[in-house]
C-alpha cells in the first residue's frame, strides 16, 4: 500500500514536470513581491491575480494554484479575492542564513489554457536576533605580577541578522584596572582585547567583574552581554583566619544524629591552592568529643555523631584547626563552645511558597505580596502555630486557611522614605514553654517618578570678572531627585531667551550631565553688567518632571579702560590745547578745564588730575584741581614767570593697576590789551599727531591765509621803504624804539620793554592763527599817531578800514560752513567772549571755587574737557542760532557773518582790512631804499616769526 502511494507520488511529480515544460511555451511571466520576515499569518503580500491579469471569477474554474518545491506552505492564495498572503512563519535566517539576498520562488499554474507564472517573494530582514557571545560568563586569570598594557584577547559576539542589523558595537563597563581595545582587521571583522591599565594587588582586589555589552545597529537596538570574571593570582603569604576566635553554639538535647552544630568558615587572603583550607579537630581533643562530633575537612561543618544527653554533659569545648595547602602550609585555630538545651520540643517551621517582588510604590492597598506556610511536627496544642509580623511596617498578615497566611499591603508606600523592608515572620507554637521559628522576607520597593528635581535654593548669585577666557567654568548648578535609577537621572539645559539682540546661548552654556555653566565668550562689564537666566533640570522618567533655578551673573568690572580725554568740540581729537592768558590775571583765575571719561565703573572710573612737573618747574604759577580738572593760577603773574608754559596734566583712575592718560595745555602769557577775546584751540592726540581744524570752514581758512600772506609781503616791502627814509621828528618818542614782529598773518608793535619776551619765546602751535593790524607810523601826515603814547601803541590795535569787504567766494564759504556757535565753540556774553568746548556731560554750572571729592562712580560731567577764557559762564546761544560776529583767532577784530537785511545799515567797522587800503596808497609814494637795510629788516622779521 505504501509502495503504491510512493509510486503514485513519483508519477505525479513527473507528470507535473512534463506539464511545466510543456506549458513553458504556452505562457509564462514573473512577479516580484517583498515581505518582512516573522510576518504573522494572513499578512498581505500582493494582489497576485490582478497583477497576472486574471479575473477573480476564473480562478477556480482554471484551477489556480501555487506550487513550490521547497517552501510550498509558506505562501498561499485566497481564491476569493486573489490575494497572496503569508500562510506560515517565515524565518529569513532559517531560509537563507547570512546571505545578503533571500527570496521565495513559487510557480503559479492555471489551466484552460495552461499557463505558468514565476513569482519571487523577497524576504526582508528585521532585527529579530540579538548579538550572542559564545559564552555568558568568561573567567580570566591574571597574576598580580602582570605588567601594565598586558593584553588578553576576547572573542566577539555574532548576530544572525545581516546588514545594519548585524553591525555590532561594543562597550565595557567602567573599571579602574582594565579597558577595551578594538582593532579592525578588515571591513567585516574586529579584534577585541582586554588591556591592563592599572597594576593589580590581589590582597586589595581579588576579583574584577566586568560586563561587555554588544549592541547591533538595528532599530530597536538589541544587545548581548558577557560577564567577564577576572581572578587575580597570588602566593601563599596569608594564614587561614576564622571570623571569630570563639563560636558559641546551643543545641537541644534531643538533637538527631548528624545535626549541624556549626559551619566554620575560615578565610585565606591567598588564592588557588594557597587558599584551599582543610579543617580538622585539634590534636589535644579528648576521645569523648571525637566520639560525639565529626567535622567535614572541606566544608568545615561540625555535626553530631552520637546521642547527646544533657544529664551526661551540659557543654563541650571543641578545638578546631584550619590548614591551607600552600607550601609551606599555614594554620589557624578557633574554639567552639557548645551548650545543650534541656527542652524536649520541636520548633515550628516557616516557608514562603510564592513571592511577588518588587512591589511598586504606588501599589494599591490589599495587594498580595507573599504566601506563607507554617508547620509544627508536634501535635495538639504544641502543634498549633500562630504567625506574627515585625511591628510598625506597612504590611500585615491575613490568615486564609489553617497554617496559611497572605502577606498584603496595609498602607501606602513611599520609596523615597523607605526603599526596602526586611520583614521577620515569627511562628510560635502553643507549648509550654512555647517554641518559635522566624524567617526573613526582603521586600524591595520599585520606584515611580513622583518627585521632580529640586535645587537647594531657587536663585543663585554668581560674580564673574569681565574679560574671562572663553569657555571658562563660572558656576555649577546641582539638582537632586529623590527618585531612583532613570527617574533620578537629571539633565540640565538653558531656558533660552533673548539678551538684547542676541540669544542667551551665545553668552553661556550648561553641561547637560554635570550642570556646569560655562561662559562661551569673554564677558564685558561695559556691555552687560547683569546676566539673569534660568537653568532647567529635568529627570529621565516617564513622564519627565522638571524645575527651574534662576542664576544672576554679575559681571564685575576690571580696570581695562584707560581714561579718555574729551575733545574740546565735535570732530576734533583730544590731546593738546593752546591758551592765551593775560599777565594781569590774579590768583585763582581758571585757565582751562581738563575733562575725561572712563568706560569702567566704580573706583576704576574715579578720575583724579595732577600736574606733571619737570625739572625747573618749581615756580610754575598754575595748579590743577584734583577731581575737577580745572587749571587755575596759584598767584598773580609777574615778569619773572616764563611767557610760555607747557603743562602736562596726568589723568589717572583709581583701579588696580591704575591707568593714565595725559593732556598737554600750552599757556602763553600776553599783555592784557593784546589778549584775544577768544583763543583758538586746537587739539592733538597723545602721541603728538597734528590736529585738524575740522570745525572751521576750509574755504574761510584758505581765504584768511591768502590775505595774510599778501599782507606779510606788503608789510615787508613797506618796512623796507620806511627804513630807507630818515624818520621825521615827532614820529616816535625819542629813546624808545618800537620793534616790529612779523608773522605769517601780519605784524604788530611792541615796546622795547616787552619785545624780548614776545619775539624770542617758544614757537607757538602751528594751529594758532593770529592777525594783528600793524601799529606802524604813518609819517607826519597822521596827526592822530603823533599824539599817541608808546603804551597806546602797545595796548590798542589799529581799527580796520571800513571799506574792506569779503570776496564773493569767501562769503559763500562762510555761509556754507558750520556755525561755530551752534557747535558750542564761541559765544559772547557780558563778560566778554567765552570759548566753550562741547562735552558729553549735562550742562551743569561749574563750581566757582573749591574742589569737591567726586563719588566712587564719577560721571562724565566731572571727567570731560571745558576751556574758558575768563571767569563767568554766560548763556550759550541756542541751537540753530547764527552768531552775530565771528572772531578771527589771534585778532581783536570781529567779522560779521550774519545775513543782514537789505534795508539795514552795515557797520563797516566790524570788518578787518588788514591795512590793505592804507598800503595801497603808500605804494604810490614808495622809493628805492637801502638794499642792505632791507635785507637786514627781512632777516629780523624771519627770526621773529620763527620765535613765535
Swiss-Prot record:
Tell me the GO BP annotations in alphabetical order: cell adhesion; homophilic cell adhesion via plasma membrane adhesion molecules; nervous system development
Q: Which GO terms describe its cellular component?
A: endoplasmic reticulum; nucleus; plasma membrane
Q: Please give the start and end residues of each transmembrane region.
A: 698-718
Q: Where is this region: 5 X 4 AA repeats of P-X-X-P?
A: 734-892
InterPro entries on file:
Cadherin-like_dom (IPR002126), Cadherin-like_sf (IPR015919), Cadherin_CBD (IPR031904), Cadherin_CS (IPR020894), Cadherin_N (IPR013164), Protocadherin/Cadherin-CA (IPR050174)
Q: Which residues are glycosylated?
A: 257, 265, 362, 548
Q: According to the UniProt topology, which residue ranges lie Extracellular? A: 23-697
Q: How does it sit in the membrane?
A: Single-pass type I membrane protein
Cadherin domain boundaries: 30-133, 157-242, 243-350, 351-455, 456-565, 588-678
Q: Which UniProt keywords apply?
A: Calcium, Cell adhesion, Cell membrane, Glycoprotein, Membrane, Repeat, Signal, Transmembrane, Transmembrane helix
Q: Identify the stretch(es) annotated as Disordered.
A: 754-801, 829-854, 868-948
Q: Which GO terms describe its molecular function?
A: calcium ion binding
Cytoplasmic-side stretches of the chain, per the record, are 719-948
Point out the signal peptide segment. Answer: 1-22
Q: Where is the composition biased (Basic and acidic residues)?
A: 783-795, 907-921
What job does this protein perform?
Potential calcium-dependent cell-adhesion protein. May be involved in the establishment and maintenance of specific neuronal connections in the brain.
Query: What's the protein here called?
Result: Protocadherin alpha-2
Question: What species is this protein from?
Answer: Homo sapiens
The taxonomy runs: Eukaryota, Metazoa, Chordata, Craniata, Vertebrata
Q: Which gene encodes it?
A: PCDHA2
Amino acid at each position: 500500500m505504501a509502495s503504491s502511494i510512493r509510486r503514485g507520488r513519483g508519477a505525479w511529480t513527473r507528470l507535473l514536470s512534463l506539464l511545466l515544460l510543456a506549458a513553458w511555451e504556452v505562457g509564462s511571466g514573473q512577479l516580484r513581491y517583498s515581505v518582512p520576515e516573522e510576518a504573522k499569518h494572513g499578512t498581505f503580500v500582493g494582489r497576485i491575480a490582478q497583477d497576472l491579469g486574471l479575473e477573480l471569477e476564473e480562478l477556480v474554474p482554471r484551477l489556480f494554484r501555487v506550487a513550490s518545491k521547497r517552501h510550498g506552505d509558506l505562501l498561499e492564495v485566497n481564491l476569493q479575492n486573489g490575494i497572496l498572503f503569508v500562510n506560515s512563519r517565515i524565518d529569513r535566517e532559517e531560509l537563507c542564513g547570512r546571505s545578503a539576498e533571500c527570496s521565495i520562488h513559487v510557480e503559479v499554474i492555471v489551466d484552460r489554457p495552461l499557463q505558468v507564472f514565476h513569482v519571487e517573494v523577497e524576504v526582508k530582514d528585521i532585527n529579530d536576533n540579538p548579538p550572542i557571545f559564545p559564552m555568558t560568563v568568561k573567567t580570566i586569570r591574571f597574576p598580580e605580577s602582570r605588567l601594565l598594557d598586558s593584553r588578553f584577547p576576547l572573542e566577539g559576539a555574532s548576530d544572525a541578522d545581516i546588514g545594519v542589523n548585524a553591525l555590532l558595537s561594543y562597550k565595557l563597563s567602567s573599571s579602574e584596572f582594565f579597558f577595551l581595545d578594538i582593532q579592525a582587521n578588515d571591513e567585516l571583522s574586529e579584534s577585541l582585547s582586554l588591556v591592563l591599565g592599572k597594576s593589580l594587588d590581589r590582597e586589595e582586589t581579588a576579583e574584577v567583574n566586568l560586563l561587555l555589552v554588544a549592541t547591533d545597529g538595528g532599530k530597536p537596538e538589541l544587545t548581548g552581554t558577557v560577564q567577564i570574571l577576572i581572578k587575580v593570582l597570588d602566593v601563599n603569604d596569608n594564614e587561614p583566619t576564622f571570623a571569630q576566635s570563639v563560636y558559641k553554639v546551643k543545641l537541644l538535647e534531643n538533637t538527631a544524629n548528624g545535626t549541624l552544630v556549626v559551619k566554620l568558615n575560615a578565610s585565606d587572603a591567598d588564592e588557588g591552592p594557597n587558599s584551599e583550607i582543610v579543617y580538622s579537630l585539634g590534636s589535644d581533643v579528648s576521645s569523648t568529643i571525637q566520639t560525639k562530633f565529626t567535622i567535614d575537612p572541606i566544608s568545615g561543618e561540625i555535626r553530631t555523631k552520637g546521642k547527646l544527653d544533657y544529664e551526661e554533659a551540659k557543654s563541650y569545648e571543641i578545638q578546631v584547626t584550619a590548614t591551607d595547602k600552600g607550601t609551606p602550609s599555614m594554620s589557624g585555630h578557633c574554639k567552639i563552645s557548645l551548650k545543650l538545651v534541656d527542652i524536649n520540643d520541636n520548633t515550628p517551621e516557616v516557608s514562603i511558597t510564592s513571592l511577588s517582588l518588587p512591589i511598586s510604590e504606588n501599589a494599591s492597598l490589599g495587594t498580595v505580596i507573599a504566601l506563607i506556610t507554617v508547620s509544627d511536627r508536634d501535635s495538639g496544642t504544641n502543634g498549633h502555630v500562630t504567625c506574627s509580623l515585625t511591628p510598625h511596617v506597612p504590611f500585615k498578615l491575613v490568615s486564609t486557611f489553617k497554617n496559611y497566611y497572605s502577606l498584603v499591603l496595609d498602607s501606602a508606600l513611599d520609596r523615597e522614605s523607605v526603599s526596602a523592608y526586611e520583614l521577620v515572620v515569627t511562628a510560635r507554637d502553643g507549648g509550654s514553654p512555647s517554641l518559635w521559628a522566624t524567617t526573613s522576607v526582603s521586600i524591595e520597593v520599585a520606584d515611580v517618578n513622583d518627585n521632580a528635581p529640586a535645587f537647594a535654593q531657587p536663585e543663585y548669585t554668581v560674580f564673574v570678572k569681565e574679560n574671562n577666557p572663553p569657555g571658562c567654568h563660572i558656576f555649577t548648578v546641582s539638582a537632586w531627585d529623590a527618585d531612583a535609577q532613570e527617574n533620578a537621572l537629571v539633565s540640565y539645559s538653558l531656558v533660552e531667551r533673548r539678551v538684547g539682540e542676541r540669544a542667551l546661548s551665545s553668552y553661556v552654556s550648561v553641561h547637560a550631565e554635570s550642570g556646569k555653566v560655562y561662559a562661551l565668550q569673554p564677558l564685558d562689564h561695559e556691555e552687560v553688567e547683569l546676566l539673569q537666566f534660568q537653568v532647567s533640570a529635568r529627570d529621565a522618567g516617564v513622564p519627565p518632571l522638571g524645575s527651574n533655578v534662576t542664576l544672576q551673573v554679575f559681571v564685575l568690572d576690571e580696570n581695562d579702560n584707560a581714561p579718555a580725554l574729551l575733545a574740546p568740540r565735535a570732530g576734533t581729537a583730544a590731546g593738546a590745547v593752546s591758551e592765551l592768558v593775560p599777565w594781569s590775571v590774579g590768583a585763582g583765575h581758571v585757565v582751562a578745564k581738563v575733562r575725561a571719561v572712563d568706560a569702567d565703573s566704580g573706583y576704576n572710573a574715579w578720575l583724579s588730575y595732577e600736574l606733571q612737573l619737570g625739572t625747573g618747574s618749581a615756580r610754575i604759577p598754575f595748579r590743577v584741581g584734583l577731581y575737577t580738572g580745572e587749571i587755575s593760577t596759584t598767584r598773580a603773574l609777574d615778569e619773572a614767570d616764563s611767557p610760555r608754559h607747557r603743562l602736562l596734566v596726568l589723568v589717572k583712575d583709581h583701579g588696580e593697576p591704575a591707568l593714565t592718560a595725559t593732556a598737554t595745555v600750552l599757556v602763553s602769557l600776553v599783555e592784557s590789551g593784546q589778549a584775544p577775546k577768544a583763543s583758538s584751540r586746537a587739539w592733538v592726540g597723545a602721541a603728538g599727531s597734528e590736529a585738524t581744524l575740522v570745525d572751521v570752514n576750509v574755504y574761510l581758512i584758505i581765504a584768511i591765509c591768502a590775505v595774510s600772506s599778501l599782507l606779510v609781503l606788503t608789510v615787508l616791502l613797506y618796512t623796507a621803504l620806511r627804513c630807507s627814509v630818515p624818520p621825521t621828528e615827532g614820529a616816535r618818542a625819542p629813546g624808545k624804539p618800537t620793534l616790529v614782529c612779523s608773522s605769517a598773518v601780519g605784524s604788530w608793535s611792541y615796546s622795547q620793554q616787552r619785545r624780548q619776551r614776545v619775539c624770542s619765546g617758544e614757537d607757538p602751535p602751528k594751529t594758532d592763527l593770529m592777525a594783528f593790524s600793524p601799529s606802524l607810523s604813518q609819517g607826519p601826515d597822521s596827526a592822530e599817531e603823533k599824539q599817541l603814547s608808546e603804551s597806546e601803541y602797545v595796548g590798542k590795535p589799529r581799527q580796520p578800514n571800513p571799506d574792506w569787504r569779503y570776496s564773493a567766494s569767501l562769503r559763500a564759504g562762510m555761509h556754507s560752513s558750520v556755525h561755530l556757535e551752534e557747535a558750542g565753540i564761541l559765544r559772547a556774553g557780558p563778560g566778554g567772549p567765552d570759548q566753550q568746548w562741547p562735552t558729553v556731560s549735562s550742562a551743569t554750572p561749574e563750581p566757582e571755587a573749591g574742589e569737591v571729592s567726586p563719588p566712587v562712580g564719577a560721571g562724565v560731567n566731572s571727567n570731560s574737557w571745558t576751556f574758558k577764557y575768563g571767569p563767568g559762564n554766560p548763556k550759550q546761544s541756542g541751537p540753530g542760532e547764527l552768531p552775530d560776529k565771528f572772531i578771527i583767532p589771534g585778532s581783536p577784530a570781529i567779522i560779521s557773518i550774519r545775513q543782514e537785511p537789505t534795508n539795514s545799515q552795515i557797520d563797516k567797522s566790524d570788518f578787518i582790512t588788514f591795512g590793505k587800503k592804507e598800503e595801497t596808497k603808500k605804494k604810490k609814494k614808495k622809493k628805492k631804499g637801502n638794499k642792505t637795510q632791507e635785507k637786514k629788516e627781512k632777516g629780523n622779521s624771519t627770526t621773529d616769526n620763527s620765535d613765535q
